[in-house]
Amino acid sequence: MSLYGISVIPVLIWVYLLLGRGRFWHVAAHRPAVLPPAAARRVVVVIPARNEAAVIGAAVASLARQTFSGPIHLIVIDDGSTDATAKAALAAARAAGALPRFELLRGAALPNGWTGKLWALSQGVTAAAELSADYLLFSDADTCHGPTSVASLVADAEANDRDLVSHMVKLSAATPAERLLIPAFVFFFFKLYPPACIADPQRRLAAAAGGCMLMRPKALARAGGLQAIRSHIIDDCALARVVKHSGGRISLRLAEETRSLRRYASFTEIGAMISRTAFAQLRHSYLTLAATLLGLFLTYLLPAVLLFIGDPPLVCLGLAALVLMSLCYLPTVRFYGLSPLWSLCLPVIAIFYTGAVIHSAVQYARGSGGMWKGRVQDA
């Protein structure tokens, strides 16, 4: 293939991404729905926590003060924390007057074959079985819910007959590293998992955002329970997959009022977050890794390279691809309240993500993949 033929590829890719792929780029926050009192449901929230003393209090308080017509019971599983996680969670529940509907569990030792988070969640699900919940809400210890978050999730599930409803929480974009890389993380996630395709029962594609997942207990049981995915490091997408493939209906939306309390002060921290699961996403295939790197080059880097070739037709092709790229990314940039100029940064961002993906593969090869809170979870 000639250089001109190769240079057309990025333009074709971005035309497809703009017009097809479920319009994944059309970012719009899910507006909370008002839940009619007659549709009140019992919700049990399960929060796994390991060394989260800095954020667990705010997470518990946000759930204890929900505007919701049904009962909400909170279960926090302290997964071997060495800090004051348990004390902070208990203090927050007490301050919110939620102790009668709050339970703190000390996590049992991690058995072989389980990831830490899924083992903690499993213990919470076992405890929740005694409460006859209509819905289980899996929430991360660093997720701060908006006041109508639970009502919105339940209303979504009831109105649209969903077995699993997931809201991707709004991630922090305060530091320079976050502003450059975090909106792109959301953009890439939705490009891989377009919400319209996730919600379509005729498609097998499935995904969820682990920070905020509401599901019916019967759907979880039908899918084989958490034991069915016990070793999966990308547990949220694995859970969505077994629920959907067992006949469940799922949906994935973007939340605005519910946000993550986790901050990434440096590029190193964000790189570690990405590389923790990147190679697992590729199913530990070096062939898929090579194809992914080629795809990243053709999609994001080649358009920028073409600007410096000096050949007018090639420059025009590169410019066309960059314009389409920016148009796709712009709604995500706006959602995070950033200048539209950030939409021009995807080629630079792609270089960083390429490095993180390679680093993830190297970590896996060294037997230290999926490092999280002192645990190697992908080796």
PLM regions with names:
Residues 1-37, 182-183, 195, 353:
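N-terminal membrane-anchoring/stem segments of glycan-assembly enzymes
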Residues 42-44, 73:
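Cell-envelope/extracellular polymer assembly enzymes that use nucleotide-activated donors
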Residues 61-71:
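Short, acidic, metal-binding catalytic loop of nucleotide-sugar glycosyltransferases
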Residues 69, 78-88, 108-109, 143:
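A conserved acidic beta->alpha catalytic loop
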Residues 84, 139-156:
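Acidic donor-binding/catalytic loop of UDP-sugar-dependent glycosyltransferases
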Residues 121, 136:
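Short aromatic/hydrophobic "clamp" motif used to bind/position activated sugar donors
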Residues 157, 163-191, 218-221, 226-288, ...:
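Catalytic donor/gating beta->alpha subdomain of glycosyltransferases that bind UDP-sugars
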Residues 288-368:
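Membrane-embedded multi-pass helical conduit in multi-pass membrane proteins
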